[in-house]
Amino acid sequence: LLMKGFTINELSIGQEATWTKTITEADVLLFGAVSGDVNPAHFNEEYAKNTFFKGRIAHGMISAGLISAVLGVHMPGPGTIYLSQTLNFLAPVRIGDTITATGKVVEMIPEKNRVKIETICTNQDGTVVTKGEAMVMPPK
């Protein structure tokens, strides 16, 4: 499968792409194993019910990973170099939540081949769980 991303000349302000995924128990277990983040807030219900969130939550970086899928696969897509990302975690993500990551082009810097993309993750209720901005270099 040969995939080609959008060049800066093929992008426009306001252009959007999304990726949606339901977060599973396996996602949390695998992320914990890969990242080493085995905080009991993610794995132990007894522990987690006494925390601020009153129950287990998924790792915030799982939602950030969905942003990476938007940028690397959908827009700009294959060939994109992910340069930077700001993130604000605004609400918890729980196992079973369906998260939609959206990237929206907000600024283009053609002379540097850079694109600033607003990044937002929402859950199935429309609650914004993660928000930030990415700077990428789209493929040539």
Range-by-range predicted roles:
Residues 2-58:
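Catalytic strand-loop segment that frames the active site of acyl-thioester-processing enzymes
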Residues 2-13, 93-140:
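HotDog/MaoC-like acyl-thioester-processing domains
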Residues 18, 22-24, 63, 98, ...:
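Ser/Thr-centric signal marking residues that sit
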Residues 33-36, 72-76, 124:
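Short, intrinsically disordered, mixed-charge
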Residues 40, 76, 92, 138-139:
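Proline-rich low-complexity regions
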